[in-house]
């Protein structure tokens, strides 16, 4: 059963403002799901499980500028989970596991590809990954707010103007 995970040790200080999500997030059935650290702790047994109906998706942790996410093969079905782990410090984990598994015949081989993104949430980079690897809604790792359909085009317009006029 192919799987992948990202683990975070300690509850990071969050900015505490409502215009920005900091915590766990993922896209399942092409819909963004966001979980705050407190919500993960309060979940039944410290686990929130998502079993999407469509193949693909991704899961990870985000804060103001950074993202750490695991990106499974987009052609298979997975079960995703947000978890709070017991221990002397708060630990959080997001993971996926292939629900069908893979059959390995004697003398044969199987291949499973997953990717890890760990870095700055740069729009052009996230869009490139989404296009290159077929990752659904990877740009939603950036919190454009409720008016995404307006704010993302405004971002592109301002970015384009910056390329022409520069920063003065």
Question: Where are the language model's segments positioned?
Answer:
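Soluble non-transmembrane domains of integral membrane proteins
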Residues: 1-138
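Interfacial loop/helix-cap signal at membrane boundaries in integral membrane proteins
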Residues: 117-168
């Amino acid at each position: 059963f192919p799987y992948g995970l990202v683990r975070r040790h300690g509850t990071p200080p969050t900015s505490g403002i409502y215009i920005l999500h900091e915590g766990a997030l993922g896209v399942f059935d092409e819909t963004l799901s966001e979980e705050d650290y407190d919500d993960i702790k309060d979940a039944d047994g410290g686990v929130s499980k998502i079993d999407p109906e469509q193949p693909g998706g991704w899961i990870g942790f985000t804060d103001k500028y950074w993202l750490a996410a695991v990106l499974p093969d987009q052609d298979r079905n997975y079960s995703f989970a947000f978890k709070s782990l017991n221990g002397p410090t708060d630990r959080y984990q997001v993971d996926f596991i292939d629900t069908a598994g893979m059959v390995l015949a004697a003398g044969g081989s199987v291949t499973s590809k997953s990717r890890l993104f760990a870095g700055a949430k740069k729009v052009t980079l996230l869009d490139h990954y989404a296009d290159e690897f077929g990752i659904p809604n990877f740009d939603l790792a950036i919190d454009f707010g409720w008016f995404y359909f307006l704010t993302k085009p405004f971002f592109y317009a301002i970015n384009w103007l910056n390329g022409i006029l520069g920063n003065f």
